[in-house]
């Protein structure tokens, strides 16, 4: 029991060593794994927005294994990064790794007790690390993804061009060959970003009048999202409306978006996918008047 207590205190001291005004020499040998934490409640939009960070880490640490810890299925085609589910057996050695938390998620906190190095946002909006000292804090209301990851990149001495960040390819599957569909992702988790249900009804009725296309609704199996899209389906009441909400994987959703002649959505995860692979897209940001 005493031995366990001593071991715990040692790990705790090591994890909180960022409070000591020293900077450790970070030397990543090829056997050090780079582990990037992107766990829920972060969404697929967060994964897309953080993808330039993964690409830059791949380019910097060319001899190291790169891992992304996330609950989402693989839908982004990185060059070398492997995906690991948090609940599955770890393919990497956390005790011999650098763990990076680019966003504040409290489930990321447990990893600092297991890793050799850590840097990122683990229990506050302050950048914390056990190999460097930083006073950077991001704004909880206006801090952008890029400002957060730039600070991490600077700490790791990684060069980047703010104006020309690279994005990866979004993966698809052979789910559909129809390119005449209009794909709509009507639901968003944040009320302030939600385009009103009644406006979506008007929009779809207008589309059905002016073109012979089929409208495909997409979304996750989130009960609130399923219910919202069911209401929309009932109010539109058309044989040319196909509600795929809750029935498509991320890869199938990506395939539908990439092959549609038009994508329409809110500021949500599917819209981030559409930004990279849709032929044409319309995205409503905040309270937008349809008229």
Task: Name each model feature, range by range.
Residues 1-291:
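Catalytic machinery of carbohydrate-active enzymes
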């Amino acid at each position: 029991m005493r031995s366990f207590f001593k071991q715990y205190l040692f790990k705790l001291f090591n994890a909180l060593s960022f409070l000591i005004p020293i900077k450790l020499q970070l030397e990543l040998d090829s056997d050090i794994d780079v582990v990037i934490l992107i766990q829920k409640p972060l969404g697929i939009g967060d994964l897309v927005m953080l993808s330039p960070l993964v690409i830059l880490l791949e380019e910097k640490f060319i001899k190291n294994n790169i891992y992304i810890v996330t609950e989402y299925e693989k839908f982004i085609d990185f060059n070398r990064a492997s995906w690991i589910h948090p609940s599955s057996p770890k393919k990497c050695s956390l005790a011999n790794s650098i763990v990076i938390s680019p966003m504040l998620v409290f489930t990321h906190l447990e990893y600092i007790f297991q890793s050799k190095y850590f840097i990122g946002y683990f229990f506050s909006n302050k950048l914390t690390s056990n190999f460097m000292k930083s006073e950077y804090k991001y704004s909880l209301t206006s801090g952008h993804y890029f400002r957060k990851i730039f600070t991490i990149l600077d700490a790791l001495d990684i060069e980047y061009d703010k104006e020309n960040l690279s994005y990866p390819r979004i993966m698809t599957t052979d789910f559909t060959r129809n390119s005449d569909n209009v794909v709509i992702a009507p639901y968003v988790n944040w009320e302030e970003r939600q385009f009103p249900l009644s406006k979506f009804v008007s929009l779809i009725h207008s589309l059905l009048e002016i073109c012979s296309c089929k409208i495909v609704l997409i979304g996750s199996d989130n009960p609130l999202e399923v219910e919202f899209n069911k209401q929309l389906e009932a109010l539109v009441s058309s044989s040319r409306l196909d509600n795929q909400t809750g029935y498509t994987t991320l890869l199938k959703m990506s395939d539908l978006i990439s092959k549609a002649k038009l994508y329409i959505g809110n500021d949500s995860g599917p819209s981030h996918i559409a930004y990279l692979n849709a032929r044409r897209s319309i995205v409503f940001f905040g309270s937008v008047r349809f008229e």
